[in-house]
Curated annotation (Swiss-Prot):
The gene is hemF. One of its GO terms (biological process) is protoporphyrinogen IX biosynthetic process. A divalent metal cation binds at residues 96, 106, 145, 175. The keyword Lyase does not apply. It catalyses: coproporphyrinogen III + O2 + 2 H(+) = protoporphyrinogen IX + 2 CO2 + 2 H2O. It is found in: Cytoplasm. Its EC number is 1.3.3.3. Involved in the heme biosynthesis. Catalyzes the aerobic oxidative decarboxylation of propionate groups of rings A and B of coproporphyrinogen-III to yield the vinyl groups in protoporphyrinogen-IX. The active site is at residue 106. This is Oxygen-dependent coproporphyrinogen-III oxidase. The keyword Oxidoreductase applies. Pathway: Porphyrin-containing compound metabolism; protoporphyrin-IX biosynthesis; protoporphyrinogen-IX from coproporphyrinogen-III (O2 route): step 1/1.
Amino acid sequence: MNEFDRVRDYLTDLQDRICAAVEAIDGKARFAEDLWQRAEGGGGRTRILRDGAVFEQAGIGFSDVSGARLPPSASAHRPELAGATWRACGVSLVFHPHNPHIPTTHANVRYFRAERDGEMVAAWFGGGFDLTPFYPVDEDVMHWHRTAQALCAPFGEERYAAHKRWCDEYFFLRHRDETRGVGGLFFDDLGQDFERDFAYQRAVGDGFLDAYLPIVERRKDTPYGEAERAFQLYRRGRYVEFNLVYDRGTLFGLQSGGRAESILMSLPPQVRWEYGFQPQPGSAEARLADYLIPRDWLG
């Protein structure tokens, strides 16, 4: 089996396993599957769970797509690849819980291959996961980062620190001067050693559930009211702003003629903006600002 097919098989299995785990913890709703084809090449399967007991919406998509020419978003940092043919596969997910005390989360693992005249000119892995709480709890954030550190440990002492820093820098809303959440891991252009890099991608993909599900279990029965729900919807606006303004995956998908429904499944089903909103000083809502600054979460 060639390298691309090995990655592809892992990713389809990862999607299956995450869906099964989410359905189990939700206990009510199930994923609906949408199989799709892309005219320019390839296709995928998008799965959406809606109106569950825990999740308002959970979307997880697998895609294996190809094209005759790299779009600008993919070659901006690699100008030598401009005009190359390409093929990419990946799994991307975003989960929006009902309860404002459960953080929203995002994860992505992907593999990209570029060719010219039938010869591979570049191939690399990318991905990571990040956490966006509305009412953060130190215990949860520390668990998230300690899980990330543990899965990084076999790949060198600097791996966690480097990819945590990259995550803090990437998921930053410059126009708001704040991070999107409390970070996690982010990496791209990892293509020096296929076996080692593929092992790391698997560690990140497999580690996501270990990082997220214990937080869901701890917070899913926390009581909340209209004020917490309103704040959750307001903060979801930041999620929308980042995805539509900065996210390279979203831009790549749209610029490459990707399937808009699947690309935009990350957006929350409900969201609100409020002009000039400021939380009351000392309130639980005001505490969030202290978490939207990069810091050491290992304790």
